Amino acid sequence: MAGLSLQHPWAFAFGLLGNLISFTTYLAPIPTFYRIYKSKSTEGFQSVPYVVALFSAMLWIFYALIKSNEALLITINAAGCVIETIYIVMYLAYAPKKAKVFTTKILLLLNVGVFGVILLLTLLLSHGEQRVVSLGWVCVAFSVSVFVAPLSIIKRVIQSRSVEYMPFSLSLTLTLSAVVWFLYGLLIKDKYVALPNILGFTFGVVQMGLYVFYMNATPVAGEGKEGKGKLAAAEELPVVVNVGKLAAATPDRSTGAVHVHPVPRSCAAEAAAAEPEVLVDIPPPPPPRAVEVAAV
């Protein structure tokens, strides 16, 4: 790192800044996992983003070790490995059995199987600079696939006309991170670091543009918070139950209150005919908890 800071002071500065921004991005899911810890349930959250983030960090550490003199890449991705591992362990601790099995399979397939194959092929089939080239393009391909993932969120925002699925702060952070790491890769002449971040910057700008365009738009009925609000309002309509046929009502002359007393079935019809209907406003059960899907 000392050599990098002396020979490429600007590269060192951007790399250090990239470490700080990326670290804050790694910490973004903390509120989600605090909620999981408090409720002792994963509440429908998915584990795939954290498994993929762990795989990405492992891949970039391997690349940095093969290339050498890439301490800044190692530090941030090592931190990422630790943080994502903690997230995954917490997820497995509180997830239902089906989600645990699925997460374990994905971990074994991607982080053990695929990573193991990449490691062996890189070490056995290539040598010297060719290792850096081969592994570099693997990192580029995987990073591009990760950056393309937000397309589903972009589609959802356009269809629902609601930005609740795409926080502006996260889009801004990811865009800044892409800019900083692109400049870092450009300054150290590493196209494998720079190229994926061009796409990352592009998607980040598109997301922020969509946020500005739709932040005051009226969500499509049944979508977004407004649609959910209408559904919740419908669920909160009072349930009116006619108890006239089930009980007899007698007024309390001292207070004027009406007391409802159960009567035998044999007298139910007579009570219904003799007494007026008594309407009881019973509040409905609370609406189901909204399921929040977490994204990195």
Swiss-Prot record:
The keyword Phosphoprotein does not apply. Residues 13-98, 134-217 form the MtN3/slv domain. One of its GO terms (cellular component) is plasma membrane. Its main location: membrane. The keyword Ubl conjugation does not apply. Residues 31-45, 93-105, 155-167, 214-296 are cytoplasmic. Residues 1-9, 67-71, 127-133, 189-192 are extracellular. It is found in: Cell membrane. One of its GO terms (molecular function) is sugar transmembrane transporter activity. Mediates both low-affinity uptake and efflux of sugar across the plasma membrane. Confers blight susceptibility. Confers TAL effector-mediated susceptibility to Xanthomonas oryzae pv. oryzae. Forms homooligomers and/or heterooligomers. This is Bidirectional sugar transporter SWEET13.
